[in-house]
Amino acid sequence: MDGSLYGECGNYIGPEIESDRDSDDSVEDEDLQEPGGSNGWITTINENQNIVLPEDKKYYPIAKEVYGEDVETLVMDEDEQSLEQPIIKPVRDIRFEVGVIKDQTTTYVSTLFLIGLMSNPALVRNVALVGHLQHGKTVFMDMLVEQTHRMSTFNAENDKHMRYTDTRVDEQERNISIKAVPMSLVLEDSRSKSYLCNIMDTPGNVNFSDEMTASLRLADGAVFIVDAAQGVMVNTERAIRHAIQDHLPIVVVINKVDRLITELKLPPRDAYYKLRYTIEVINNHISAASTNAADLPLIDPAAGNVCFASGTAGWSFTLQSFARMYAKLHGVAMDVDKFASRLWGDVYYHPDTRVFNTSPPVGGGERAFVQFILEPLYKIYSQVIGEHKKSVETTLAELGVTLSNSAYKLNVRPLLRLACSSVFGSASGFTDMLVKHIPSPREAAARKVDHSYTGTKDSPIYESMVECDPSGPLMVNVTKLYPKSDTSVFDVFGRVYSGRLQTGQSVRVLGEGYSPEDEEDMTIKEVTKLWIYQARYRIPVSSAPPGSWVLIEGVDASIMKTATLCNASYDEDVYIFRALKFNTLPVVKTATEPLNPSELPKMVEGLRKISKSYPLAITKVEESGEHTILGTGELYLDSIIKDLRELYSEVQVKVADPVVSFCETVVESSSMKCFAETPNKKNKLTMIAEPLDRGLAEDIENGVVSIDWNRVQLGDFFRTKYDWDLLAARSIWAFGPDKQGTNILLDDTLPTEVDRNLMMGVKDSIVQGFQWGAREGPLCDEPIRNVKFKIVDARIAPEPLHRGSGQMIPTARRVAYSAFLMATPRLMEPVYYVEIQTPIDCVTAIYTVLSRRRGYVTSDVPQPGTPAYIVKAFLPVIESFGFETDLRYHTQGQAFCLSVFDHWAIVPGDPLDKAIQLRPLEPAPIQHLAREFMVKTRRRKGMSEDVSGNKFFDEAMMVELAQQTGDLHLQMI
């Protein structure tokens, strides 16, 4: 059998055919044929048909083929960008501000005219509107905005005002102001002369008094808005003291005068008594707050520094403007000032003789203010509200006003606004008051610079600021930061004192920690944009002259609270403006953490922005790692947490229950001299502690006495006011924990026992240790307060190597702690001053609510001219959480309260008494509170429950202590 006929598997394949052989030969010939040759239907070899490996394939054209030879292309690796950063960032537009319609930005004067007024400081007035909550500051601003803009801030349909300077959505929802917002308005006086009035509308709630502090720093005067019905309330009192301390002139606007007519329904004579009483109370507070009351002008309508107004009805006047209106109405040429001076006080008009006299006419009569001002005002209100059209027409005609027939078809409130605004005209009287009693930036420069600038008076910068020199060195004081619409960065708001700030200019940004000796807190930034801030819109400008307020972009990166801007190229020493001095303290704190731990960096960044946005807010990290926020009260912290969640971090945040800050103090002198040796056993410090004199801590905090005084000044002050001996008064080394701290360190050593040169050599180290200890006390790491530390003995090594700061600082801190613990230590808690408005039948319930919370009433008096009572009380801050809700519940919502920090008080009980047993879920007795507060505070901070004596007492000190007391139980101290 022929094997070639079968395959490998035995299948028959048959013999080879001739045609198959020819086909194979032809294929071999084709493979050998040259390219371009002709061989049947195949003519060329296409390279694209060759087999190409996957890694060699070309899927897309190269960049040169697409863009050409002249275009440079850059290729970045895929891992150059973090995973958290999106390739295309979404546009962040957080709607936290109220939008503005284009028509609402149109003013009666051109923008160029407004900018031109900025260059003439004599035509500029910088003021802040301050006052109590709901006294009408924002609505009064609405009236001024309406008179300068082609718009109406009043909605006739729902009888509500726009609240133009409440730019945040939550401000509109809560019906309170949270942030201070400026506006620059061109107002005309009675002679039709235009002035640029930079006005800052500040919050009236005492929780946000830090905004008022930042505003007063930029202002040359304070305009107090006082409710005619309520009178002077707690925030007005505090604002008066604040303005006096800042050396600012004061003018008053008695607002809501129509409440005396429509709500209280007082007769005109009683309304006059009510207004006069309000002015007397203001003058009493001014006199009480001033150290030299003789230099302060009293508030007197006859002097022109009082304006009567109703923001809701859209009218305002002074006695001078009312007298001018009478002169114009009757066409009589008269001395307006003399006539105005007779419209206030016990002055009567005698119609028979046509003269004014201090005695009433025969048969009786009303005072001139009642006869010429209140009675016509009452007549307008009564007739418009009574809807007597004919009588209204007659009354308005007597005053020279005619309204159209369509006007009388309006509702009562719009008709009242129209009638009053037609009678009283524009706010020219208010402008006259500002021009006459508030100095221009040039006139106020010396007083402002002396109060806020830390440099010397013999420097060129000081002279330029006093002169408001536009060609001098640039100096800008920044006190406020406003977030942009995406809340990623801030624009800063400040006042130019000298020089001219321009866009594109490089400036040095000096922080609060800057000094010519330590330039670490300094950066150089470029000003990218400048605006005039107009609440809901901004006017771009290219430069800002001295005396102007300006909003600045591009310099916020290193600013936390306040800053000083100066020329980047200026070579002389530059000092900063002082940090803001607030009239309250942030004593309420809460801890926060993100719901998702991976979002902690976002929350930390949000907390940093919170610190920028809120002047008094303090954010810090405890030793336990928790992030805490300190604020003035519950409302303040609520606003902060809302902004943290919705604006600045956009993460879900968990918030702990609020707690309070404590202080540590002593009530007796140290029971023995306490000493501590340095680690190298070459030095030894001996110290005792004792309480400070009553009132001294407040004097230090208020700046009545300063550690920067020389020894003679300090000696005279302490010797005359606190009866210190001259040697002790001149031995003061430092205040602690800072220059305005409420603790004092004295060198009470004898020159015969201690080498003075060696003591002076280690003075700085001992002071640092003392201030470190005063900042964090031994009980629960809270600041020490009201303690005097005396160095009674010291053994200092003569070799500098053995008495270095590393040896002396911790030793000074330790001996201060031991002296403190041997002086009967106590805890101090913050206490609120509470002012409650209530009807008389709710006073008993208020006493009950306060007594349950360790509070007590100091006075309850009727509010003059009203059916309400004013209850004044003190309440520990730690007991205040939920107090307002509790109060409203027990009074059926009829009582309204405001609370503000007032003083520190000692907590009942001994915090070191280990015999006290704290039981969970049970209220502690009053005498156990100090122990409970200390233990819980230490737990929260991640510390051990008890104070360990081994940490603060040397072994030799413990032995001596045991010998004197016969007990070593003090290890628990």
UniProtKB/Swiss-Prot annotation:
Residues 17-33 have a biased composition (Acidic residues). Residues 131-138 are annotated as: G1. Residues 255-258 are annotated as: G4. Residues 381-383 are annotated as: G5. Residues 122-408 form the tr-type G domain. Residues 201-204 are annotated as: G3. GO terms for biological process: mRNA processing; RNA splicing. GTP binds at residues 131-138, 201-205, 255-258. Keywords: GTP-binding, mRNA processing, mRNA splicing, Nucleotide-binding, Nucleus, Spliceosome. The keyword GTP-binding applies. It is found in: Nucleus speckle. One of its GO terms (molecular function) is GTPase activity. The keyword GTP-binding applies. Residues 175-179 are annotated as: G2. Disruption phenotype: No visible phenotype under normal growth conditions. Belongs to the TRAFAC class translation factor GTPase superfamily. Classic translation factor GTPase family. Splicing factor involved in pre-mRNA splicing and component of the spliceosome. This is 109 kDa U5 small nuclear ribonucleoprotein component GFL. The gene is GFL.
